[in-house]
Design a protein with these regions (language model features):
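Conserved donor-binding loop and adjoining core beta-sheet/short helix segment
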Residues: 7-10, 19-97, 204-205, 209-222
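Conserved GNAT acetyl-CoA-binding A-motif
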Residues: 94-108, 221, 250-262
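Conserved acetyl-CoA-binding loop-helix of GNAT-fold acetyltransferases
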Residues: 80-93, 226-229, 235-252, 257, ...
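Flexible, substrate/cofactor-facing loop regions flanked by secondary structure
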Residues: 35-37, 140-222
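Hydrophobic beta-strand residues of extracellular immunoglobulin-like
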Residues: 51-54, 198-201, 244
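A short beta-loop-alpha structural element at the N-terminal edge
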Residues: 2-17, 149-163
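C-terminal "cap" of GNAT-fold acetyltransferases
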Residues: 130-149, 256-271, 277-292
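Acyl-donor-binding surface of acyltransferase catalytic domains
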Residues: 61, 68-147, 286-290
Length: 292
């Protein structure tokens, strides 16, 4: 049996190396971003050692798990036995925190994690699609709905934007759990990928009716972190216009493509909207859920 203990910041480099190794083994490339890992750990604060664990064998780090307030679980392990030991700790802690469920996202090619969750009583719930849109073709101009104006994010907009996101996501996902506002603001804005000029806010008569939040372009790629439209504005082309506005903005900054992730079961029609806008799926992630 591996040694399981609480995670500390001294483990950071070894955990990132493990995540990178497991990603490359499953996908042939790495989709691990150390800065994202760092920000998730920072949000845990003093609870990191209680809500996150590492597995060690002969002094080598061979597994890691992170329990988040959103009732999501991150898991990486060299084999399913190590994964099971970490999962047992995570489930026990989740029950202590009165979580209603645990959700874990993994690619089908990650054999140790998929075997762990299947054996651990998780059910495959739905898929997340990763999609990309090339920007080297003719880009249509955005057509804004009558009466809607668009501007970049300002320092005083955080609470309104956060509320719009939470309302939109909770409106169709009964399991959605938002972050505390201070945690959300820290995760979203206090890092190098944040650029307020890439956060587009759509308003009607001063009311926020849509937003599209993007990360700064990296190595020629842009990223749509969040895009939502208030239910009162859906069906008028605002989502498409926000995307097209982003295409032109990214292209003007030299990006060659833009990507996003979307829940395949999103009932607002988002996956179909993205396909019509030129996005193509290149990776699928399964969401596994266990009710506690």
């Amino acid at each position: 049996m591996p040694e399981i203990r609480g995670t500390t910041w001294d483990d950071f480099d070894a955990v990132v190396e493990l995540l990178d190794t497991r990603s490359r083994k499953a996908l042939g490339t790495s989709d691990v971003e150390p800065e994202i890992v760092r920000r998730r750990w920072q949000l845990a604060g003093d609870d990191l050692v209680r809500d996150s664990w590492v597995a060690l064998e002969d002094g080598q780090l061979v597994g890691h798990a992170l329990l988040e307030p959103t009732q999501d679980l991150g898991l990486a392990a060299r084999d399913a036995g190590i994964g099971a030991a970490l999962l047992a700790r995570a489930i026990r802690r989740a029950r202590e925190r009165a979580f209603a469920r645990l959700a874990l996202t993994a690619v089908d090619e990650d054999d140790p994690v998929c075997e762990t969750v299947r054996n651990g009583g998780f059910a495959r719930d739905r898929e997340i699609l990763r999609m990309w849109r090339a920007l080297n073709t003719a880009l249509p101009e955005p057509r804004w709905p009558d009466g809607v104006t668009v501007r970049p994010y300002g320092d005083d907009d955080g609470e309104r934007v956060h509320a719009l996101l939470d309302d939109a996501y909770a409106g169709w996902d009964p399991d959605y759990i938002g972050r505390d506002h201070d945690d959300w603001l820290s995760f979203m804005t206090r890092h190098e990928e944040f650029d307020p000029d890439l956060w587009f806010l759509a308003e009607r008569a001063g009311a926020l009716v849509g937003c599209a939040l993007h990360w700064r372009e990296t190595e020629g790629s842009g990223w749509v972190k969040d895009i939502v439209v208030h239910e009162s504005e859906r069906g008028r082309g605002l989502g498409t216009a926000l995307l097209q506005h982003a295409f032109h903005t990214y292209a003007g900054r030299g990006a060659a493509r833009v990507g996003l992730k979307v829940d395949s079961t999103n009932p607002t029609g988002a996956p179909a909207l993205y396909e019509r806008a030129g996005f193509v799926t290149d990776q699928r992630y399964a969401i596994w859920v266990k009710r506690l």
